[in-house]
Amino acid sequence: MRQTALALAGALSCLAATAAPAASPADTYPSRIVKMIVPFPAGGTTDIFARHIGDRLAKAFGHNFVIDNRGGAGGNIGSDAVAKADPDGYTLLVGTVGTHAINSSLYTRMTFDPLKDFAPVAYLAGVPNIMEVNPKNVKATTVQEFIAEAKASPKKLSFASSGNGTSIHLSGEMFKQMTGVELVHVPYRGSAPAVNDLIAGQVDLMFDNLPSSIEQVRGGNLRAIAVTSLKRSVALPDVPTIAESGLPGFDASSWFAIFAPAKTPPEIVAKLNAEVLKALADPELQKRFADIGGEIRPYKPDELGAFVKAEIEKWAKVVKTSGAKIE
């Protein structure tokens, strides 16, 4: 009888073990610090959005989301580090239109594939660039006045960028191509040092992401000539678009999104996406983003993936037309 009872107990135990659902990697995620790599220096637009969302994720999950700035090569250095990281959800990338839509067409050699080597997590925001000038160096207050001033002195005026191949750089190249003006390109390792030199008068013009320059524009240190989106920005409603200023069709907006290494468990990606969307639905964060020109899109991972694919195709045409290439 005792043997029968033991056998029955053993059978029930095995049955219970078989019926128990397998543990998901997301069940205990995160259990330690998560690193968010920003592939540009601190102080730029990518860094601003990363810190906003990193703070929210830390509060939601109870573990710090630490920002790790790794600038260089138009964002490729930091992006490559994430592409090669363990796909466990503890190393994330705050990617951009540059790292995931432009660079694959611009650079002759890439160490990662923006589609194959990453798992899309969540879209953060899209922003226009500001065509801004040092008010002491440049007299122009409109796009047409700037074109006239630049054509009067070919190659005298310079434009700064956050690095070769960034949307900030290509905005300038598009402007040169569509207007025929000759400007000297001065690349920097990130937006922050470029803006500092623009304010100091070391360079004359920049097509910077709106968030990293808007306070300098509002404070009078820089003069906004126009924005690069097709519609005016709610953050600077009185500043016209380049398209409405005599260059119809001009559109060079930037965007920012979170990516994980490819093969990161879908459950972890879904968990991160859910918390990001929850944070982006908060009116307080929405206002913060709107104040710096950020337009939120509540994309699911598959929607972000489709968006990135379309952006790669769009910017490939822009890069080809511009003739820009980086070895």
Where do the model's predicted regions map?
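C-terminal lobe and pocket-closing loops
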Residues: G126, S212-A281, A310-E313
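Hinge/capping helix and adjacent helix->loop/strand transition within the periplasmic-binding protein
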Residues: K84-Y90, S105-P193, I242, W255-R288
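N-terminal (or domain-start) structured segment
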Residues: A22-K116, K156, G180-L205, Q216, ...
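An extracytoplasmic/periplasmic, membrane-proximal ligand-sensing/linker region
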Residues: S31-I33, M178-T179, R218, T241, ...
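A ligand-binding cleft/hinge motif common to bilobed small-molecule-binding domains
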Residues: H100-R109, H169, M174-M178, L205-V239
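Short, low-complexity disordered leader/linker segments with a strong preference
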Residues: M1-S31, I326-E327
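Short beta-strand/turn micro-motifs at beta-sheet edges
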Residues: S24-A26, D117-V121, A243-G249
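Beta->alpha turn/N-cap motifs
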Residues: V94-T99, S161, S191, D208-S213, ...
